[in-house]
């Protein structure tokens, strides 16, 4: 196994585009095998969002961003790294496409547009809609996305914008359409043809969803109605996407947080810094993204539905780890042994299944509640 210094040194020497090319080959094979089917509404969405991977007060490199932290002991300059990631939302499972670091002196949208252009060049037919949070509801992002032949979707939550004021006034004058979904009861409004956003070259569409669902409070165990008010702005016309499709695409934005950043940081330790250099940190994150995509594809495409119902991805990862360490020589602890017994014999090949069973039963995880359909 390579040491931490070796991992950092090698990642600093590797070109990031070479790792991106391998990830693109993985996408190409999955697409050819029809493993990336679109959702029920037929539109593939690429979610864009930023993530902060590292922050400290001492070390600084050429790719570090700076901010001033105000504290009781005075102001301190903090150095940190942020990047924009793009994740493809499909009908089967999400797939991370690419990562672009935010350079000093630029904002998140500038890095997102650079990442968007690279995705359109290398993944021209991978997605139909580029979606983001409220920060992406900007005219430069919408105009650039439309100029490349894609549609844009973002959360609209700035109460001072004329577009949101006009949409809310129309909602007060128009009766809502009630829809029962898996999330609960929703009251929906859908208006298109807004021209009160003069910086945007095309007329936009506003979709509002007031969702009510029952939640059980952890403190007293009582059920309580929770109301959430969501508003999205998009360039998708009503003839291309229904109201329910826009709502589902808007909620799919959380997949990059729950199944993207959360998975990579907590289970894959993608934020670990082996070497504080911009290229080394970027390459290691791209390698982690590639490993995550490979393991997810193996779990969904190579395992039978019955096995996926019994074991989750964490248990399968323990099986990988058990097989890896079972074939490594284990150095004996204590005083130096004789030369002929310096290392213990590795486990024989036929004992791999025993190591798998021990890895699974050591710390069992709860099985999945629902069985997934068989792969196409």
Describe the role of every protein-language-model region.
Residues 4-91, 364-367, 375:
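Active-site-proximal, Lys/Arg-enriched surface segment
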Residues 66-127:
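Electropositive, glycine- and tryptophan-enriched low-complexity nucleic-acid-binding patches
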Residues 240-274:
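Short amphipathic alpha-helical "interface-anchor" segments enriched in bulky aromatics
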Residues 180-195, 265-376:
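A short, flexible helix-boundary coil/loop motif
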Residues 151-253:
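An anionic, glycine-rich sequence signature occurring as long contiguous blocks
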Residues 106-163:
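Domain-level cores of phosphate- or acyl-group-handling catalytic modules
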Residues 3, 7, 42-53, 86, ...:
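Short, conserved catalytic/metal-binding motifs centered on acidic residues
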